Design a protein with these regions (language model features):
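TOPRIM metal-binding catalytic domain and adjacent DNA-binding surface shared by DnaG-type primases
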Residues: 1-20, 156-160
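TOPRIM fold recognition
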Residues: 72-160
């Protein structure tokens, strides 16, 4: 909960006369990724999120829920972070990754995740390490974390 409060905000919105709320995760262009138990979407503009703390290693995640899972596991200590917020944003992330000597990818174990990993590897070769191999039986890092501690982690019951 503390981790989500550090990086996320509650976004209230109205759609067709009804009031809704979602967890919002800001990108570098001031758009938001939005999540609630019934909705997954975003506000424009769509972009990556980059936490630049002048480290030589960068962790790369497809979405902010995996990023928050990595924060819980303390994987992001002493690293910079790029959250793609969609694999379609890989073109926006590649120039940012130039500055890093090690690029640790925590991408999804699906075709889109593998294709994204392949694009990063094509651009940066041996600087790229695939960490999705550490959770081969799970779709993503968050699903792996939920499997590791099912009573402590619930993807949809975050409250602010």
């Amino acid at each position: 909960m503390e981790i989500a409060q550090r990086y996320c905000v509650q976004v209230d919105y109205q759609l067709r006369g009804k009031n809704y709320y979602a967890i919002g995760f800001e990108n570098r262009a001031s758009g938001y990724e939005l999540r609630n138990p019934f909705f997954k979407g975003s506000t424009p503009p769509k972009d990556i999120t980059h936490f630049d703390n002048n480290h030589t290693r960068c962790n790369v995640f497809e979405g902010f829920i995996d990023f928050l899972s990595a924060e819980k596991l303390r994987f992001n200590d002493l690293c910079d972070v790029v959250v793609l917020n969609s694999v379609s944003n890989i073109g926006k992330a590649l120039p940012v990754l130039t500055q890093y000597s090690l690029i640790a990818c925590y991408l999804d174990n699906d075709d889109a995740g593998r294709m994204t990993l392949s694009k990063i590897q094509k651009e940066y070769g041996d600087k790229v390490v695939d960490f999705s191999r550490h959770y081969p039986d799970h779709k993503d890092l968050n699903e792996n974390l939920m499997w590791m501690c099912p009573k402590k982690t619930n993807k949809y019951k975050l409250k602010f």
